[in-house]
């Protein structure tokens, strides 16, 4: 049913005036960047950045309220209680997990935290105008944009700047909005299924969503990519019952804005956008053609053109970067098994139990005419998304967030079928089996840190590996700080688990002292440059047994060879207390042509494949010799 035009309300005016105020501040900061206002802070946070973050949440809440009105969703008292209980359970679990863990965030797990610290410093040092420009550039040119950090800046203002509290604030900020939208999604799906027991369906749906481990894995490990899922569910809610039979400019505006926000959140959400809108567009146009509603086709085409033109303008620099890059080559180290292997991985992520629920929902959804189109849409969306994603790389836990809506929909259809049962004993038995298993599955994942869980359960351990070597890592760090002066570095070759350079860099955050002396490291073929610190660092560290990733072991073998070792002497070693021993080598002779030539010969094949990552580095080193 088409929504009627509405009058402006107080929320609309607040958003309009706050947007105008920020726009004025942006212009003034470009002209007069040194005004005291742009240097003011609140609890150490730059006030203009704080204001931008508050505005971002205000804008998001405005979108959510409009989407709720447009979908016509109404929550009963029992629905609200179920939602409140679900959020309470989740937030309590996150708090427990964060308070009991012994974990060092590293690599992608700590990157958003570093970016959060960085965006605060950037806005304070460079001003509001340049800070916003940096955010825009990060969307255009970086794999990780600062959009998520803009949203998290205001909540993060009032807590100590530690990685654990960054995760806590991310959860407290994102989960309420996300699960409110999931609750709306359940109510919309309920209209399609028309269960006989609506209250049970909602409670069961919330149970399935709360206990779905794939939703929580990334955030619990420090990656707030879950924010993008808010935009995804908003897009689904705006399109799931809309067929372009009537013009709705507000809906078009919201969709275009949400598509932009989804792309800006994380670049790989574009795979979901492509798959979803291809499926959606084909469905809408086919329906219109079959019913001979040519005006619907016209509206669909015009919306597509307007959206495409807007995205082309907004993301033109990003489009150029993507077209020039050869991601299938540079990300080849992450493409380990292709499409078929990814299907197997997804089955393992889900586990036999949840996979059975999804398959049951698929069969039931196809059999029932009311849910047939929705079920087929979800299936095609899943397989199409996986197919185009694996043209570049395979999916990690965080990437799998883009499949969560389809998985959840198929589980809801399964449970919706149960809620249509008329015999009470069958209803009680079936719902107990499905929800009982999902609860057990969630509990197993929530209490496990194992790399591999039994096949009936989701292979998604939610407890990070508990470290027993933090004091030993700190001892290595203290040694590095004592022996490295300003400008000197210690290069750590291992690049796997449990040891890699980032483990040492991140161990004492928010103290960044060690990061000034320990480089990020290099190992991934096609992505990382040749580690020139093998020839420039004052110290080089390696370990036994070795922790490998991609080229790391080859770098280690090369370093321990005769020619490089002529330039080093071992000066220290550290027993990490878990079977690993670290050895520290000090450079006693400066690099020379023989050493450079040795690495050139050893990595000739890699340089031939990626000259910009190897030969260019060696050329610069040779220039330094001259």
Would you name each region that the model predicts?
Residues 66, 165-195, 234, 361-366:
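Transmembrane-helix motifs of polytopic, lipid-linked glycan transferases
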Residues 432-482, 496-502:
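Membrane-proximal, lumen/periplasm-facing interface regions of secretory-pathway glyco-
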Residues 142-180, 218, 222:
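Loop-to-helix entry region of an early transmembrane alpha helix in multi-pass inner-membrane enzymes
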Residues 99-110, 123-150, 171, 345-349:
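Membrane-proximal lumenal/periplasmic loop motifs of glycosylation machinery
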Residues 112, 118-122, 273-283, 287-371, ...:
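Transmembrane-lumen/periplasm boundary regions of multi-pass, lipid-linked membrane glycan transferases
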Residues 462-492, 497, 506-626:
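C-terminal luminal/periplasmic domains and tails of membrane-associated envelope-modifying transferases
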Residues 217-227, 396-397:
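Short acidic/glycine- and proline-prone juxtamembrane loop motifs at membrane-interface regions
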Residues 1-95, 199-202, 298-307:
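Start-transfer (signal-anchor) and selected internal transmembrane alpha helices
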């Amino acid at each position: 049913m088409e929504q009627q035009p509405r009058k402006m309300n107080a929320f609309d005016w607040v958003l309009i005036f706050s947007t105008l105020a920020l726009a004025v501040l942006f212009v003034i900061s470009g002209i007069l960047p040194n005004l005291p206002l742009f240097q003011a802070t609140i609890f150490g946070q730059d006030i203009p950045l704080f204001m931008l973050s508050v505005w971002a949440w205000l804008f998001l809440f405005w979108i959510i309220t409009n989407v709720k009105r447009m979908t016509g969703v109404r929550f009963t008292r029992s629905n609200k209680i179920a939602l409140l209980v679900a959020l309470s359970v989740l937030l309590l679990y996150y708090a427990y997990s964060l308070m009991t863990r012994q974990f060092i965030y590293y690599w992608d797990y700590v990157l958003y935290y570093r970016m959060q610290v960085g965006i605060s410093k950037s806005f304070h040092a460079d001003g509001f105008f340049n800070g916003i420009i940096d955010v825009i550039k990060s969307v255009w040119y970086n794999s990780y944009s600062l959009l998520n950090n803009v949203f998290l800046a205001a909540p993060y203002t009032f807590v100590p700047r530690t990685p654990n509290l960054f995760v806590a604030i991310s959860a407290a900020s994102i989960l309420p909005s996300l699960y409110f939208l999931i609750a709306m999604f359940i109510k919309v799906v309920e209209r399609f299924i028309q269960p006989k027991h609506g209250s049970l369906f909602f409670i069961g749906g919330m149970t399935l969503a709360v206990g779905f481990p794939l939703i929580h894995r990334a955030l619990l490990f420090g990656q707030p990519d879950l924010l993008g899922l808010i935009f995804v569910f908003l897009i689904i809610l705006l399109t799931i019952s809309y067929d372009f039979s009537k013009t709705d400019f507000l809906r078009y505006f919201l969709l275009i804005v949400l598509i932009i926000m989804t792309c800006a959140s994380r670049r790989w959400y574009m795979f979901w956008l492509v798959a979803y809108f291809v499926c959606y567009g084909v469905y809408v146009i086919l329906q219109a053609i079959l019913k001979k509603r040519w005006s619907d086709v016209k509206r669909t085409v015009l919306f597509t053109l307007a959206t495409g033109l807007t995205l082309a303008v907004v993301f033109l620099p990003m489009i150029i970067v993507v077209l020039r890059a050869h991601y299938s080559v540079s990300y080849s180290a992450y493409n380990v098994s292709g499409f078929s292997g990814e299907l197997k991985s997804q089955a393992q992520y889900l586990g036999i139990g949840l996979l059975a629920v999804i398959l049951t929902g698929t069969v039931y959804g196809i059999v029932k005419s009311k849910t047939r189109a929705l079920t087929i849409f979800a299936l095609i969306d899943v397989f199409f998304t996986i197919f185009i994603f694996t043209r570049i790389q395979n999916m990690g836990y965080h990437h799998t967030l883009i499949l969560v809506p389809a998985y959840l929909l198929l589980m809801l259809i399964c449970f919706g079928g149960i809620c249509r049962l008329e015999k009470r004993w069958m209803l009680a038995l079936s719902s107990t089996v499905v929800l009982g298993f999902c609860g057990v599955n969630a509990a197993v994942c929530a209490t496990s840190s194992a790399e591999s869980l039994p096949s009936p359960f989701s292979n998604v351990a939610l407890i990070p590996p508990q470290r027993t070597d933090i004091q030993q890592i700190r001892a290595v760090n203290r040694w590095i700080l004592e022996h490295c002066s300003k400008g000197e570095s210690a290069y750590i070759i291992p690049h796997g688990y449990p040891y890699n350079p980032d483990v040492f860099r991140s161990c004492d955050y928010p103290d960044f002292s060690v990061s000034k002396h320990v480089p990020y490291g290099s190992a991934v073929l096609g992505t990382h440059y040749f580690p020139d610190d093998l020839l420039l660092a004052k110290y080089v560290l390696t370990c036994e047994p070795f922790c490998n990733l991609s080229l790391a072991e080859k770098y280690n073998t090369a370093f321990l060879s005769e020619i490089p070792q002529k330039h080093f002497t071992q000066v220290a070693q550290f027993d990490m207390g878990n079977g690993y021993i670290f050895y520290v080598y000090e450079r006693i002779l400066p690099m020379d042509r023989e050493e450079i030539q040795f690495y050139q010969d050893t990595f000739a094949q890699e340089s031939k494949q990626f000259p910009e990552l190897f030969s260019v580095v060696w050329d610069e080193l040779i220039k330094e010799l001259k």
